[in-house]
Amino acid sequence: MDTSLKNNDGASEADNKNYQDYKDESGNINDVINAIKHNSMVDCCHKNYSTFSSEWYMNERKYDDIAEGPSPKKSVVHRCTII
């Protein structure tokens, strides 16, 4: 699965969705904030690493970065900080 971003057109769409979620579900603000944090981390990791596995550790804010190529030898854990 190619998760690299050739351009960042999706960023404004994600921002719009985050705002819409906030407007529509102001009573569930904690859930919305958590979703925004998750989306921000995905965006951060997309920008900094071209590929990553689907295994997320949300509480520890880390994921396994899989090297590109036909047979990656090991996974390297990177941390992605939400600003």
From Swiss-Prot:
Which segments carry the region annotation Disordered?
1-25
Where in the sequence does UniProt note compositional bias of the Polar residues kind?
1-10
What triggers expression? Expressed in the early phase of the viral replicative cycle.
Compartments annotated for it: namely: Host cytoplasm
Work out whether the entry's keyword set contains Transmembrane.
no
Please provide the record's keywords in A-Z order: Early protein, Host cytoplasm, Host-virus interaction
Compositional bias of type Basic and acidic residues: which residue ranges? 14-25
Statement: the UniProt record of this protein carries the keyword Chloroplast? no
Q: Where is it found, in Gene Ontology cellular component terms?
A: host cell cytoplasm
* Coiled-coil ranges per UniProt: none
Major location (coarse): host cell
Q: How does it assemble?
A: Interacts with host IL1B.
Its biological purpose is as follows: May subvert the host innate immune response by interacting with host IL1B and interfering with its function.
Entry similarity comment: Belongs to the asfivirus L83L family.
Q: What is this protein called?
A: Protein L83L
